[in-house]
């Protein structure tokens, strides 16, 4: 893998992990568009660990307060968030553990299917953004809502859906304000990324030394871009919502269709 490819894929992961555009779809589609070889599993781990670092650094004060108050003051607003995050993590972690390899094998080269998923979820994102009644902050959230967000997060395994996209959309449907839905999506991302990253890293630890250069480049690029993506999304959500990401999904789906037809 060239340095350019490692940087480019790191940028895609950093953006796609936190913007509702599906990082997994981008990491499949763009190498296909450019005719690149499929990247290794250990490089994929590096990209995800980079975005984990991004969210931990961006929200480090929140995480410390959530953990401390979750233990010492579990009924406080911040204390409840710890248990909401735990509950929301369980369904996705379980689904990922049992079905991740199956989903990856089914979707790996199904470019048209990914295009369809991108477009369909784009319509859902647009509709929910336009019609949802955003009344509540995270302090109004309850554990059943957290559980529902977690259950639907499991579907993010399918390339084109987007973990951040489906969790934010579910939050909006449940009445959360846009910024609150985005923040909860980011906060609950750390455990699921950490769990998946550690499991994959342990399985492929022997490959790290031979691919250390691309591993390091992908890690730091996705971390830096991921940090900026979090800030960008929170800012754009305050101003204009999620519609811009729906439009992007439509354009990418159309591009995939055109390229696929030209290559027949």
Curated annotation (Swiss-Prot):
Location of the protein in the cell: Cell membrane
GO biological process: cell wall organization; peptidoglycan biosynthetic process; regulation of cell shape; response to antibiotic
Main location: membrane
Keyword Cell inner membrane (UniProt): no
Any Pfam family the entry gives: BacA
Enzyme class name: hydrolase
Entry's EC annotation: 3.6.1.27
Transmembrane stretches, start-end: 14-34, 40-60, 79-99, 112-132, 141-161, 182-202, 214-234, 242-262
Membrane topology qualifier: Multi-pass membrane protein
Gene Ontology molecular function: undecaprenyl-diphosphatase activity
Keywords on record: Antibiotic resistance, Cell membrane, Cell shape, Cell wall biogenesis/degradation, Hydrolase, Membrane, Peptidoglycan synthesis, Transmembrane, Transmembrane helix
A GO cellular-component term linked to this record: plasma membrane
Record's catalysed reaction(s): di-trans,octa-cis-undecaprenyl diphosphate + H2O = di-trans,octa-cis-undecaprenyl phosphate + phosphate + H(+)
Superkingdom field: Bacteria
UniProt keyword Cell cycle, yes or no: no
Other remarks in the entry: Bacitracin is thought to be involved in the inhibition of peptidoglycan synthesis by sequestering undecaprenyl diphosphate, thereby reducing the pool of lipid carrier available.
Function of the protein: Catalyzes the dephosphorylation of undecaprenyl diphosphate (UPP). Confers resistance to bacitracin.
Protein family: Belongs to the UppP family.
The protein's name: Undecaprenyl-diphosphatase
